[in-house]
Amino acid sequence: MTRTLRILTGAVSALAFAAAAHAADPELTVFDWAGWEIDGALTPYVEKNGAKPTYVFFADDDEAFQKVSSGFKADVVHPCPGAVPRYREAGLIEPWDTSKVEAFAKLDPKLFESKFIKDDGGVWFLPFDFAYTAIAYNLNDVPEGDVQSLEVFKDPKYAGRISISDNSDDVWALAFLATGVTSWDDVTDEQVDAAAAWLREVAPNVRSWWSDPSELAQMMASGEILVAWSWNDPVAILKADNFPVGFNRAPKEGSTSFFCGFVNMKDGPGKEDKVYDWVNSMYAPSSAAPIVEAIGYANVNPDAMATIPEDAQKAAFVDKIDTTLFLQTPMKPELRDRLVEEFELIKSGF
């Protein structure tokens, strides 16, 4: 995949990254999604501290939480908001000092409406990146008309050529949208049952439940998968390789948008000041283009996104769209447990 070093300019940046190539900063451990060690987003951090942070990676939120709750020590973690209630209940995180977050005043207050994200105790989660889960498809082999509805996942024509995210939130957002539900905030038992029934009809068509963006990109590039419920990043990987991939974010039922962000780990092993150096580096306007280019995700800092031309945002599928959007907000822990358990049963054929 094309990376972002060409965006970096200036002798200071070049020297900083030359030093970083030899050693990671031991005073900051970042626990992040695979693929998120993006050099262009770390320029301000490296210029100030001389080296990139120490990175450790995870594949999904469940894996990340299990690791930190079992004793793994990190300074900052990059979960999506659905995982935040578990971090709080386990006493693993502490509120952010928002006065040290340079972009904080620019962030949309609507992102902080959940009591799990912000309450009287402070801000527990800093929203950072957002993207979509929508229909990725092979432009050569799948007619555009076939992907105008989520029912494509039930189409026998694509049996065994479909892949769906092995992520409970993504899967249930898909199933709820397909059955006419656009939020899980007040979902009923009947609506859960209807969504589960829809998923059970889809499951026999699924060749793989993908868990890694590069894995999905490889399966689509090989022709093994023709239609997928995908994040932006597999599409970005395929487009960087000039593969003919489409990404329909506006089927008739809608698509889903998710955002992820940062939690400040209590008793992290590194230096707290460097946690904020890293956060500010990620929010920096100079970081937006490298992240969009590398993995196709947008930055919730409007000043950062303003640095990216509209046509480039459209090409990366991070421009605003006019469609029904199922926003993946934090859900009640008891609902999450129920949906995770039901999803495991569905994947197992029950």
Q: Which residues does each predicted region cover?
A:
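C-terminal capping/gating helix-and-loop segments adjacent to ligand/active sites or protein-protein/ligand interfaces
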Residues: 289-350
